[in-house]
Each structure stands twice: as C-alpha cells, then as structure tokens.
Amino acid sequence: MAQEQTKRGGGGGEDDDLPGASAAGQERREKLTEETDDLLDEIDDVLEENAEDFVRAYVQKGGQ
C-alpha cells in the first residue's frame, strides 16, 4: 500500500517578526503556568485532607 507523507510548516506568518507578539505570548504563558500551579496546589491540599473520600468518589464515577 502506498503511504503519503505530508509536512506542515510551522505557523510561519507575519506575526513571527513582531517582538510585541512574542512578549505577549510569553506573558500569557507565564500567567497560565501560574494558574495551573495554583490549581494543582489546591488539588494537592484536597488530597492531603481527604484522599480516601476522593478515591472512593473517583471509583464510583467509573475510575479504576
């Protein structure tokens, strides 16, 4: 059987040349990273306080 391979170029557009776009993207990425870290910390706190109930609820919802 013949297989086709396609290559996609990386987003190359006019936005690559704008330094402001890169700085804004970096700022957004840092904010999202901070929000994700905060959410993971909150999950860790819940698990530390009540891991048994968390696991029980997870299994009841179909988790393994």
Swiss-Prot record:
Linked residues for Isoglutamyl lysine isopeptide (Gln-Lys) (interchain with K-? in acceptor proteins): 64
Keyword entries, A-Z: Coiled coil, Isopeptide bond, Ubl conjugation pathway
Region: ARC ATPase binding, residue numbers: 21-58
A GO BP entry: modification-dependent protein catabolic process
Coiled-coil residues: 23-52
Subunit structure: Strongly interacts with the proteasome-associated ATPase ARC through a hydrophobic interface; the interacting region of Pup lies in its C-terminal half. There is one Pup binding site per ARC hexamer ring.
Note on domains (UniProt): The N-terminal unstructured half of Pup provides a signal required to initiate unfolding and degradation by the proteasome but is not needed for pupylation, while the C-terminal helical half of Pup interacts with ARC to target proteins to the proteasome.
Similarity comment: family membership: Belongs to the prokaryotic ubiquitin-like protein family.
Protein name: Prokaryotic ubiquitin-like protein Pup
Organism, as annotated: Mycolicibacterium smegmatis (strain ATCC 700084 / mc(2)155) (Mycobacterium smegmatis)
Gene: pup
